[in-house]
């Protein structure tokens, strides 16, 4: 296995010339073999015959071993990368051996790393888009590309896709404080990287993902408020967590945000009085529980009353800007993540961004950010899409399958009641 060991790849161009000479020579030897019996004795003929047979078998095995069909994973990757170099003309043709782009690859922590070294040759314009070509050739998801070193590009591929979480009661019992597991590899450290935007059209799985986040927060002794202007799925939770925690009108949502703002003031006073309002300290140092507001399609109420709408935007901006230290967090859900729905100044302060279901490119950019020219190859269907989490060192979003509620595995409303 080639884990953590770098394997070098170059395209020498010997396929077209030297290999042709080699196999032509084998054919000549075979032709001579047919004529030899009349000129040499039987014993010598047998030795020559077996020599040519063995050389032929070794050649056939070598061709197979170094091909894309090889039983060796390392050789399969190597052959495919040579094909990428050849097909994209990332070499300078020489008389015998071409001067090509050099690649190195290795596996580290379930990911395949491929490094491309241009070595002064003008491949840079091609290298920026080469990751998508390699992604297609290897049939692996490109999850990151980096140009943080002057002499190389690094492409990171997901070798083994993360396992989806299937929601069960035991899952919430094992949750770490301040952290919510999202799949077998990803988690959201909301205490350090606060607030979330969840975007997705009807049927994309957005609501169930929000249910999962609400359950996760409740299992960590959080206070959760819900604003649902459409009075749909989330609104029904008022019968479980209490009517005073669920609002649907413009004034009701403004009221929740006022409570969140006032909670920040209260916590600031507590932390100041107890000497905890120091650099690097937050709500956890005084054993305060998270205080969360979940708002689904908050833009719906903004047209009802412009004065209240302005108050909502002002309070929302204040809570998102200052809430992290005080343990006050916001989750925004929407079908249309445009600037009218969620102002850019607010979106830029959100750490967790998730798109679920089929979304057009513009919607993906508004949700995930404008800094990404490419997205990894991934399915956009119910409960599946893309995710970006601040603080993880990612340079691009990654594919994501949201936690799944299996039929009859967990009663959602009973679970909310249990953890409330």
Roles of regions detected by a PLM:
Residues 2-15, 37-44, 262-420:
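P-loop NTPase motor-domain active sites and their immediate coupling elements
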Residues 236-240, 345-348:
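Short, conserved catalytic or adaptor-binding loops enriched in Gly and charged residues
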């Amino acid at each position: 296995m080639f884990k953590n060991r770098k394997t070098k790849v170059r395209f020498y161009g010997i396929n077209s010339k030297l290999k042709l000479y080699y196999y032509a020579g084998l054919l000549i030897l075979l032709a001579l073999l047919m004529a030899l019996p009349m000129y040499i004795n039987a014993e010598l003929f047998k030795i020559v015959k077996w020599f040519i047979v063995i050389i032929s078998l070794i050649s056939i095995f070598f061709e197979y071993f170094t091909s894309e069909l090889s039983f060796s994973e390392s050789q399969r990757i190597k052959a495919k990368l040579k094909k990428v170099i050849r097909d994209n003309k990332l070499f300078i043709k020489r008389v015998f051996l071409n001067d090509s782009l050099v690649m190195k690859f290795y596996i580290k922590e379930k990911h395949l790393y491929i490094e491309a070294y241009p070595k002064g040759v003008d491949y840079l314009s091609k290298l920026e888009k080469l990751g998508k070509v390699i992604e297609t050739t290897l049939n692996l998801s490109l999850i990151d590309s980096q140009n943080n070193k002057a002499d190389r590009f690094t492409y990171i591929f997901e070798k083994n896709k993360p396992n989806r979480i299937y929601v069960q009661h035991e899952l919430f019992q094992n949750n770490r404080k301040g952290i919510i597991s999202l799949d077998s590899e990803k988690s959201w450290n909301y205490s350090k990287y606060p607030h979330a935007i969840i975007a997705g059209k009807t049927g994309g799985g957005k609501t169930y993902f929000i249910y999962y986040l609400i359950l996760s927060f409740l299992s960590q002794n959080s206070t959760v408020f819900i604003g649902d202007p459409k009075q749909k799925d989330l609104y029904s939770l008022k019968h479980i967590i209490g009517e005073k925690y669920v609002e649907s009108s413009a004034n009701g949502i403004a009221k929740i945000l006022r409570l969140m703002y006032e909670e920040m003031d209260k916590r600031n006073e507590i932390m100041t009085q107890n000497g905890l309002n120091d650099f690097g300290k937050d709500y956890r140092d005084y054993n305060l529980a998270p205080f969360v507001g979940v708002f689904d399609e908050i833009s719906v109420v903004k047209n009802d009353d412009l004065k209240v709408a302005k108050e909502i935007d002002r309070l929302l901006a204040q809570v998102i800007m200052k809430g992290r230290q005080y343990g006050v967090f916001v989750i925004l859900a929407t079908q249309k993540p445009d600037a009218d729905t969620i102002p850019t100044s607010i979106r830029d302060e959100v750490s967790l961004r998730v798109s679920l279901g089929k979304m057009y490119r513009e919607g993906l950019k508004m949700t995930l950010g404008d800094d990404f020219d490419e997205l990894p190859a991934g399915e956009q269907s119910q409960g599946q899409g893309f995710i970006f989490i601040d603080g993880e060192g990612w340079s691009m979003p990654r594919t994501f399958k949201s936690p799944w509620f299996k039929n009859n595995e967990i009663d959602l409303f009973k679970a909310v009641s249990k953890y409330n």
